[in-house]
Amino acid sequence: MIKPRTPPGIMELLPREQIAFQRMLDVIRRNYERFGFLPVETPVFELSDVLLTKSGGETERQVYFVQSTGALANAAAAADEGAESGGLPELALRFDLTVPLARYVAEHEHELSFPFRRYQMQRVYRGERAQRGRFREFYQCDIDVIGKDALSIRYDAEVLAVIHAVFAELGIGDFKVQLNNRKLLRGFFESLGVAEGELQLAVLREVDKIDKRGAEYVRDTLAGEGFGIAAAQVDKILAFVAVRSNGHADALAQLQALETSVGASVTLGEGIAELREVLELVKALGVPETAYCLNFSIARGLDYYTGTVYETTLTDHPQIGSICSGGRYENLASHYTKSKLPGVGISIGLTRLFWQLREAGLIAGIAESSVHAMVALMDESRLDDALDIARRLRIGGINTEVQMEPKKVGKQFQYAARAGIRFVVLAGDDELARGVVAVKDLVREQQFDVARDELASTLQVELEQAKAMLVSGIAAN
């Protein structure tokens, strides 16, 4: 007999956990749609030559390729005959949602209205080394605004407002959207004489590690043989990336101080101007100043970001790391079209976020069920009544299960409790003779009678009053 087991790197949930996960998806989707983003889905696999526009490197080593049994047989036969391999398999599973978006926009460019506002919530696949908290299959929940030729910086502020709306409704505790601009970093590096493009990108990648690896690690790396940056310059870089703002006015003051002390090179001046505009618009969008700050160390490791960058963290749980990130890029689809398609977007890695929240004990919705009520059956002769009660409840918007076979009441209560069902409806001879049903509330441990015709509306009121937030922060110590 084969031992049942899931592959490593997969998060498989029990039903009540899946309900909590699904509700988080629903919150994210609802907020994306409130801001006018349109749904898009792309195939789970793409043509390999389209997906892997840059061959080699870490990305290709993590890609899952797809090959039919016929193609495998043909490849094996060719190998037996000494023929050379025909190259990569034709198809590959997507490893993020950004490359499929680039292909999608380029392919449908003349059918889309720009700026194109899309959201996409699908699984992606990476051949990660199996370890705790790392997944080979995981959900990403992305939004992007794509422009044609140009895209206003105002959309960068709107994206930050979307981040705030999502996490405010999720209710997973206080959070902070940390904001920076790559032009700010590049302009500052230029003022230190670090102007060569590849060197700048390499320094940016190291700076982005400062929160994870610490300032001393970054200092040793930048001053080491690989970079050879003078110690005095490294000190200036570390002092610069240590800047954090506290409140809206302080953020603007930090930008003014930077402009005064360093001097506004073209690149630095653009970065400062863009951040100023984003900050002013974020305020106009109603995002509270406690929800965002400047953090000059945020660079985002991906090289295609060119302007605004975001990282979101939970204030009381920094060990969880970034829960949402993204930024501005200048040309999304340069490998697929000559059109210039700048954009800005963010991604929530929901699988990892959910896993981290569960590990930290922050998921409050796990004890819930999508079934609100169960109609008990104590006597075979009352099956028709039980089915009618369930039908009326469903019409009234109450998700309802019926016990199809009579059992002892205690066993039916036990079943409902284990399934996370809150209300058990009892319709025995005595209740029906009085025109009522009895309702057992397993959460409050109370029982009450309700007129049969008022049952659905009564339970609706009870559910609305007791509607708990999906997730809650741990109470302050």
From Swiss-Prot:
Q: Which reaction does it catalyse?
A: tRNA(His) + L-histidine + ATP = L-histidyl-tRNA(His) + AMP + diphosphate + H(+)
- Write out the annotated subcellular location: Cytoplasm
- Its EC number is 6.1.1.21
Which Gene3D superfamilies does this one have? Anticodon-binding domain (3.40.50.800), Bira Bifunctional Protein, Domain 2 (3.30.930.10)
**Keywords, in A-Z order:** Aminoacyl-tRNA synthetase, ATP-binding, Cytoplasm, Ligase, Nucleotide-binding, Protein biosynthesis
Q: Which family does it belong to?
A: Belongs to the class-II aminoacyl-tRNA synthetase family.
Subunit (UniProt)? Homodimer.
Q: What is this protein called?
A: Histidine--tRNA ligase
